[in-house]
């Protein structure tokens, strides 16, 4: 018998020593961040530490997470900074439209 394991996917933003934000997707954020810190992740982050995991959010499917990642990568730097500052949530509706909303408290 095989047991179905529910897998969550995360989209994340990592800040490097040049203050740039890198966006990625993974099914294990702790493992992936450690890989980035060890220089075994994305080429864009190699040699640019220290790295800081600034923001992340989870999705129930890889497809949805990848759609959100694409959306974030299209944002301007200032919009990505808003995601971090506001601790915003990313949502994908039934029509596969991606949006973000603030969840910070005033």
Swiss-Prot record:
InterPro entries: GIY-YIG_endonuc, GIY-YIG_endonuc_sf, UPF0213_domain. Gene3D superfamilies: GIY-YIG endonuclease (3.40.1440.10). CDD domains: GIY-YIG_UPF0213. Residues 7-82 form the GIY-YIG domain. It comes from the Bacteria. Belongs to the UPF0213 family. This is UPF0213 protein VPA1222.
């Amino acid at each position: 018998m095989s047991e179905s394991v529910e897998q969550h996917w995360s989209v994340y933003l990592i800040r490097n020593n040049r203050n740039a934000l890198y966006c990625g997707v993974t099914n294990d954020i702790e493992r992936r961040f450690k890989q980035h810190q060890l220089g075994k992740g994305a080429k864009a982050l190699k040699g640019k530490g220290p790295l800081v995991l600034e923001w992340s959010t989870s999705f129930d499917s890889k497809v949805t997470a990848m759609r959100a990642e694409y959306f974030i990568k299209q944002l301007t730097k200032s919009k990505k900074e808003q995601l971090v500052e506001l601790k915003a949530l990313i949502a994908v509706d039934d029509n596969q439209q991606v949006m973000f909303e603030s969840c910070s408290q005033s």
